[in-house]
Amino acid sequence: MPQLALIRHGQSEWNLQNRFTGWVDVDLTDEGVAQARQSGELLAKAGFEPTHAFVSVLKRAIKTLNFTLEGLDRLWIPVDKSWRLNERHYGALAGLDKNETRAKHGDEQVKIWRRSFDTPPPPVATDHAYHPLNDHRYADVPRELLPASESLKSTLDRVEPYWSSSIQPRLAAGETLIVAAHGNSLRALVKLLFKVSDPDIMEVEVPTGNPLLIDLEDDGITLRSARYLDPVRAKPLPPLPGA
């Protein structure tokens, strides 16, 4: 039976500082490291034995994956890194304090930027340090694919091809997979897996450092069950398709 574990990185420095992060490559806090280690412990207790891992190219997700795999004694499994699993790009909001941004633009506007499906924040300038054109890790990505800002819809548009070409076929082959990524790239995967409507995805949140363990049918698409392994820090999940 295929299994999939989705893990949002542990608490980052900018999570702690309440700043918009996006593609900015900030590190984990000590609490984030502890959450990542706990993820490995929770998955080990659940008997989870991944055969392959996927992760973004941002260090907070990479370190979360490594600490998790260490707890599983599975550091040896193959790991694929892809920019397509990066967090949503927050455009000109990157680095800004969220409370100050609410005070300036209003709660409702900021909620739309953060939680709506198809409204991106204002774009970042192409000469800004936070534009991916100026980051060497994206040197091999076609220029036209690099975002200056993203909505959840555009995040889904870049995540979905990677899911379809690299992740889902392995599930259909019966593998056990782990994906370490970010709040919005994982929301995109949740939308795909649970078939969540555009309006309903606004209310879906993915907590940091709490594995979402999903059991699938042999087709690697149909969900059998899904649960967060730490119920104390769990967020509500959408209903299973067809339930």
Swiss-Prot record:
Signal peptide: none annotated. Its EC number is 5.4.2.11. GO terms for molecular function: phosphoglycerate mutase activity. It comes from the Bacteria. GO terms for biological process: gluconeogenesis; glycolytic process. It is an enzyme of class 5 (isomerase). The record marks 182 as: Transition state stabilizer. It catalyses: (2R)-2-phosphoglycerate = (2R)-3-phosphoglycerate. Pfam families: His_Phos_1 (PF00300). The active site is at residues 9, 87. Keywords: Gluconeogenesis, Glycolysis, Isomerase. InterPro entries: His_Pase_superF_clade-1, His_PPase_superfam, PG/BPGM_mutase_AS, Phosphogly_mut1. Catalyzes the interconversion of 2-phosphoglycerate and 3-phosphoglycerate. PANTHER family: PHOSPHOGLYCERATE MUTASE. Homodimer. This is 2,3-bisphosphoglycerate-dependent phosphoglycerate mutase. The lineage of its organism: Bacteria, Pseudomonadati, Pseudomonadota, Alphaproteobacteria, Maricaulales.
